[in-house]
């Protein structure tokens, strides 16, 4: 089938009427317990509909699709202010969440499922936010590998971490419809998307009291299933228009930016190049109705020498920092992951202190409940981003100490009881945390080997930077570390890793058999 025929077939699917099976699938995936919108229809009501009820709901959606208009309740948002911290009399200390009609959100999800196959092939690889099969780990690995290789060959990397002011709320809707047209969203599908915004309005609800309705003419609808994909399309167009020749060369690739929704990192090999890239990006943002926050955007240089990186936006100088937290992980100008691991241990200790009396040692709380909190809060806090760590014996010892600090207290023990860690884990039926970390690292290695050509993490994984290594012992590379881990723990030599991990089912079954690391614990 030719590309023209494929496009026509794709268009006929997305422009066709909405089948009941599609509505049923979306309704079944609704999460129970969610707050209703202005119509007070809860997700449980929709999930309890029988075949007849779903057929009537489908008829309603097809009327909206055919006429290009929706009920007013679907266009109405209920804004509920949530207190953050500080003075309760200050409006800036509240964050508003918007509750939308559940039937309207189901309709929006149906539209989102039709938009995805059209726009996904058109969105640049540099954007990983709100995209299926991608997450923060993709960009965290890409940036880590880029900095690792650049440090090895003494190539400086100039970075600007860009913060956009209230990006979701500033998207001009008129411009957005034009961008959607450019990206192939046209005809009845575009009309259906616009229908959710045509008479957009909101009210504020506080302690049961409601304000008067007021119109909303700009920005994306908070809480709408359509908003994420609409936003990344709009950001992709800004990124495309601001793209230039600058960037950081890594093997055969030149990487100039990384985007995760509105989290933007601009990359260049010199301060001058980075200033040019930032100037273009700022101009495109301004033209698209967005503004860069100069107080929150920061510059950083990853280099063996201290290098100044003065950057300006609109005549204002950006701060230059020695470390920056990107997507939840701390990156430093020296590129050492030890600072991030230390921070993770410190943050997890703070979490344990905050719940010590109310959870950890509370006798009225069952062990099952305590371990549930351990798995859902403590472990993710301690190990976020662990797939990228290069573990040493010191690191393993510190991670195990942080792990057992919590588990001993759950078991009602202390170090003075001189009970082995393995005994405590066996009693609590908890998997060793180091085993979880190593299994995840090897799982990510297999994922990188299997990534198709064109995916950025896979490309930098396979690429080798060029240049001359300076004198001295090089740092341990993540790939060397995890290859050695596979050899030590699974008996797979480095030259066979790609072949073995290339079969996902085989690799997953091997990892499920990974035994705990032998040791004194």
Model-based region annotation:
Residues 1, 33-36, 55, 67-72, ...:
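Short helix-interrupting loop/turn segments at helix-coil junctions
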Residues 19, 38, 42, 53, ...:
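Hydrophobic (often cysteine-bearing) scaffold residues that line and stabilize catalytic clefts
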Residues 1-91, 106, 330, 468, ...:
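Surface-exposed loop/turn segments and immediately adjacent short secondary-structure elements
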Residues 3-12, 187, 204-224, 228, ...:
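Short linear motifs embedded in intrinsically disordered, charge-biased segments
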Residues 16-28, 56-63, 110-115, 139-151, ...:
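Inter-domain linker/hinge segments that demarcate the starts of reverse transcriptase
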Residues 92-123, 138-141, 165-168, 217-245, ...:
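Conserved pre-motif C helix in the palm subdomain of viral-like polymerases
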Residues 40-49, 63, 127-134, 161-167, ...:
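Conserved short loop/turn motifs at secondary-structure junctions
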Residues 33-41, 79, 89-99, 137-181:
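Conserved catalytic palm subdomain of right-hand nucleotidyl-transferase polymerases, strongest
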């Amino acid at each position: 089938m030719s590309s023209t025929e494929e496009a026509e077939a794709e268009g006929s699917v997305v422009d066709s009427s909405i089948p009941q099976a599609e509505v049923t699938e979306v309704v079944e995936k609704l999460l129970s317990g969610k707050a209703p919108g202005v119509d007070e229809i809860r997700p449980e009501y929709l999930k309890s509909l029988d075949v007849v009820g779903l057929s009537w709901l489908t008829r309603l959606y097809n009327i909206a699709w055919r006429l290009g208009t929706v009920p007013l309740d679907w266009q109405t948002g209920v804004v509920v202010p949530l207190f953050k911290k500080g003075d309760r009399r200050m409006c800036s200390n509240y964050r508003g969440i918007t509750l939308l009609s559940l039937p309207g959100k189901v309709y929006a999800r149906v539209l989102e499922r039709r938009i995805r196959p059209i726009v996904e092939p058109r969105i640049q690889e540099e954007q990983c936010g709100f995209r299926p099969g991608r997450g923060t780990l993709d960009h965290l690995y890409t940036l880590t590998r880029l900095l690792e290789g650049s440090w090895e060959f003494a190539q400086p990397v100039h970075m600007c971490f860009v913060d956009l002011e209230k990006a979701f709320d500033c998207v001009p809707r008129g411009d957005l419809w034009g961008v959607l047209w450019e990206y192939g969203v046209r005809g009845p599908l575009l009309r259906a998307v616009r229908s959710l915004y045509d008479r957009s309005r909101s009210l504020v609800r506080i302690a049961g009291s409601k304000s008067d309705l007021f119109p909303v003419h700009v920005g994306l609808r908070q809480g709408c299933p359509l908003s994420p994909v609409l936003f990344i399309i709009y950001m992709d167009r800004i990124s495309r228009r601001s793209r230039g020749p600058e960037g950081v060369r890594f093997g055969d690739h030149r990487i100039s930016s990384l985007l995760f929704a509105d989290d933007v990192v601009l990359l260049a090999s010199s301060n001058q190049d980075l200033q040019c890239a930032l100037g273009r990006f700022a101009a495109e943002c301004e033209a698209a109705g967005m503004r860069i926050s100069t107080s929150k955007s920061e510059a950083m240089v990853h280099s063996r020498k201290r290098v100044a990186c003065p950057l300006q936006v609109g005549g204002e100088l950006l701060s230059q920092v020695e470390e920056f937290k990107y997507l939840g992980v701390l990156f430093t100008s020296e590129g050492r992951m030890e600072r991030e691991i230390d921070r993770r241990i410190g943050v997890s200790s703070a979490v344990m202190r905050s719940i010590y009396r109310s959870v950890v040692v509370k006798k009225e709380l069952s062990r099952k409940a305590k371990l549930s909190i351990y798995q859902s809060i403590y472990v993710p806090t301690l190990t976020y981003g662990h797939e990228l760590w290069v573990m040493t014996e010191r690191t393993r010892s510190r991670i195990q100490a942080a792990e057992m600090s919590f588990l001993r207290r759950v078991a009602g023990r202390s170090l003075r009881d001189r009970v082995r860690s393995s005994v405590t884990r066996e009693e609590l039926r908890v998997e060793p945390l180091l085993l979880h970390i190593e299994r995840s690292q090897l799982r990510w290695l297999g994922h990188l080997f299997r990534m198709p050509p064109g995916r950025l993490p896979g490309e930098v994984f396979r690429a080798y930077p060029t240049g001359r290594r300076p004198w001295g012992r090089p740092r341990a590379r993540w790939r060397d570390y995890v290859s050695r881990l596979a050899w030590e723990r699974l008996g797979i030599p480095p030259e066979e890793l790609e072949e073995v991990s290339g079969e996902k089912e085989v690799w997953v079954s091997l990892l499920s058999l990974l035994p705990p690391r032998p040791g004194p614990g």
